[in-house]
């Protein structure tokens, strides 16, 4: 049975090295379980100065507790050399949980409210003179087995399973980045 720790919030199995405390020095980083991943494969090319693609595959199993048997992520960044669509990023996760009944959920955080249209999620960044845009198209799971939820907005910035857990001592967004909280997509 799944056990919830850390203030009754489902951490998704994420492991917290050194008891969740920041490391004070390099010795702590090297000795207290901070290694959370390993590169399995990588490639880029064909031009080494301006590659058309970059491929990376990693094993991130060590970043999680016993809830996860295996987690590997592969991604390919494509330089499309286009002003309208400069790049594409393809991400493929292979995850095996220790309990097949655990619900697997992929999170995508955003500062501004995301928009959902079928299997497409659009996220923009227009405040503070930004003009970024990302369109996420979900290929797996198939649309007939896909659930996409949008969570966030006032009073739901840190909402987990229906309960908002507001952060304590957030920096003033007028003087710092406003990237904490806001919105996320849960895809399962």
Regions found by a protein language model. Give the residues of each.
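Intrinsically disordered, low-complexity regions enriched in Pro/Ser/Thr/Gly and acidic residues
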Residues: 140, 147-149
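Catalytic and substrate-binding regions of extracellular carbohydrate-active enzymes
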Residues: 1-133, 142, 152-167, 175-188
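PEST-like, low-complexity acidic/proline-rich intrinsically disordered segments
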Residues: 148, 168-170
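Active-site-adjacent helix/loop segment of glycosyltransferases
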Residues: 137
């Amino acid at each position: 049975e799944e056990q919830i720790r850390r203030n009754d919030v489902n951490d998704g199995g994420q492991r917290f090295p050194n008891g969740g405390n920041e490391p004070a020095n390099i010795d702590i980083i090297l000795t207290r379980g901070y290694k959370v991943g390993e590169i399995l494969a990588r490639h880029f090319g064909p031009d080494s100065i301006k590659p058309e693609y970059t491929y990376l595959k990693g094993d991130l199993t060590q970043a999680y507790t016993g809830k996860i048997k295996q987690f590997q992520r592969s991604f390919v960044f494509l330089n499309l050399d286009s002003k309208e669509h400069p790049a594409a990023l393809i991400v493929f996760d292979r995850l095996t949980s220790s309990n097949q009944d655990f619900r697997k959920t992929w999170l995508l955080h955003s500062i501004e409210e995301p928009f959902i249209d079928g299997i497409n999620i659009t996220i923009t960044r227009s405040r503070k003179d930004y003009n970024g845009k990302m369109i996420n198209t979900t290929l797996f799971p198939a649309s007939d087995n896909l659930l996409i939820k949008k969570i966030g907005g006032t009073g739901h910035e840190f909402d987990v399973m229906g309960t908002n857990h507001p952060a304590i001592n957030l920096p003033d967004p007028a003087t710092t980045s406003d990237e904490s909280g806001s919105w996320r997509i849960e895809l399962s």
